[in-house]
């Protein structure tokens, strides 16, 4: 049967059932078509929408709703037995749609999520069982199936998880997803706490936590009972509850076994979403200092976190400059995080009250690196060193010494391998490397080197941002 014929047959079965809701054969044919599509891994959107059409109608018309009378329980009648049959088909179909969340085709996975959420919203206001003392209940069992599929999949589900952001405007959705995330903090088995689970869990948190504390107040000016704030159930979810959830979850996830990917993901989440909600940011000290030693992008993100703690929370880190100093190695020129490293170093070294021995060590280390740097990075280094000298005029003597011959390269007292910048003998050295760059084959490099060594230097610093192409608030290093 051709694709067109199959679609026509499917549509015909949907219409036949909607015209006669006792037509079990037509309903069974639709569900069988769904199973067949899943088994043969053919496009699923059409069959998902067909099932959505059927069960949305059954939910809204209450054709599946069984009324439970107080003290009498569920009546055993042919009508209720048929409704029970329809409910079973509904649950069967819902489970099939859940499987589609893992589809390789993003459009199918997105449609599966949209349909699941539509079922949840409608079922919440049109429950499968009604009682005399009717109260709207959130279908948390179905939501749990969605969240569990996203978390426990043996693949990265980011392309589906990001679509959940469309529902974070609803207080009840956020309230119950947080409940489920807290429930899943401790997986059933150790095997479940794998890299895929951790990445998916962190991605869910990234969707749920607003970038700033006030971003989840979209409807703050509306009445608390405004139905636009709720998917199906009026339930309070406020800033205080968000803060409580974030703090509880952070204390768990920071202790999970992380590889480089999840460690980087965790740090980005911390910097962009979590930190502003933490009740005791000082407790991050050990974690960030330990992470600084990992290397690469992870260390740089940890450095960003320490920078925030220093400037926003008045915390001190005695050996932070040693950590920063150690990051400047030849490998940085081949890594994506290079602009961010220079940007942060520029901020950390912005104070004019820093010891000259410390600043001189950074200037000298960068000068040495300029000899092996690509041309575009040599320019950044030269302007960076120039700015350090403008901030600390006492360093001009390093240029003067170099201009007067300085030290023979073989007799340079500077210790490049010394971990402590204050013990590197940078002040006893000279910036002879910049003198060498004045003879560089590329005119714009040689001219820049001449500008740096010219006396006097300009009063205003060079704007590194033009060369780094990095925004001050950009900490998303992926």
Question: Positions of the model-derived regions?
Answer:
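Alpha-helical solenoid scaffolds in large eukaryotic transport, assembly, and signaling factors
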Residues: 1-324, 348-351
């Amino acid at each position: 049967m051709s694709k067109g014929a199959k679609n026509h047959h499917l549509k015909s079965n949907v219409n036949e059932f909607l015209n006669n809701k006792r037509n079990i054969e037509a309903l069974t044919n639709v569900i069988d078509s769904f199973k067949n599509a899943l088994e043969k891994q053919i496009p699923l959107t059409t069959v998902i929408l067909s099932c959505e059409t059927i069960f949305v109608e059954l939910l809204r018309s209450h054709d599946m709703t069984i009324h439970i009378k107080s003290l009498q329980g569920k009546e055993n009648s042919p009508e209720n037995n048929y409704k029970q049959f329809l409910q079973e088909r509904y649950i069967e179909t819902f489970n099939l749609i859940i499987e589609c969340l893992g589809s390789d085709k993003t459009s199918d996975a997105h449609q599966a999520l949209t349909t699941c959420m539509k079922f949840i919203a409608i079922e919440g206001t049109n429950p499968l069982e009604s009682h005399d003392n009717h109260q709207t209940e959130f279908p948390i069992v179905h939501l749990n199936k969605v969240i569990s599929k996203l978390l426990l999949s043996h693949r990265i589900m980011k392309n589906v998880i990001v679509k959940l952001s469309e529902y974070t405007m609803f207080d009840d959705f956020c309230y119950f997803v947080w409940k489920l995330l807290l429930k899943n903090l401790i997986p059933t088995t150790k095997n479940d706490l794998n890299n895929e689970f951790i990445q998916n869990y962190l991605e869910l948190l990234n969707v749920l936590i607003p970038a700033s504390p006030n971003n989840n107040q979209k409807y703050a000016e509306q009445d608390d009972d405004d139905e636009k704030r709720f998917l199906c159930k009026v339930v309070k979810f406020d800033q205080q509850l968000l803060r409580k959830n974030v703090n509880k979850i952070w204390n768990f996830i920071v202790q999970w076994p992380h590889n480089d990917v999840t460690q980087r993901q965790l740090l980005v989440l911390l910097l962009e979403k979590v930190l502003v909600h933490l009740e005791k940011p000082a407790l991050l000290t050990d974690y960030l200092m330990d992470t600084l030693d990992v290397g690469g992008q992870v260390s740089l993100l940890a450095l960003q976190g320490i920078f925030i703690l220093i400037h926003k929370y008045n915390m001190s880190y005695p050996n932070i400059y040693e950590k920063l100093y150690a990051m400047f190695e030849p490998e940085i020129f081949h890594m994506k995080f290079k602009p961010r490293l220079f940007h942060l170093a520029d901020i950390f070294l912005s104070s004019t009250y820093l010891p000259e021995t410390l600043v001189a060590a950074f200037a000298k280390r960068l000068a040495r690196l300029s000899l092996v740097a690509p041309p575009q990075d040599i320019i950044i280094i030269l302007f960076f060193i120039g700015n350090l000298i403008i901030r600390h005029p006492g360093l001009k003597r390093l240029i003067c010494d170099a201009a007067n011959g300085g030290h023979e390269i073989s007799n340079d007292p500077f210790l490049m391998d010394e971990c402590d910048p204050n013990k590197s003998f940078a002040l006893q050295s000279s910036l002879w490397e910049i003198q060498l760059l004045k003879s560089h084959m590329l005119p714009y490099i040689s001219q820049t080197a001449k500008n740096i060594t010219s006396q006097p230097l300009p009063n205003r610093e060079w704007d590194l941002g033009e060369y780094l192409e990095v925004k001050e608030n950009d900490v998303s290093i992926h």
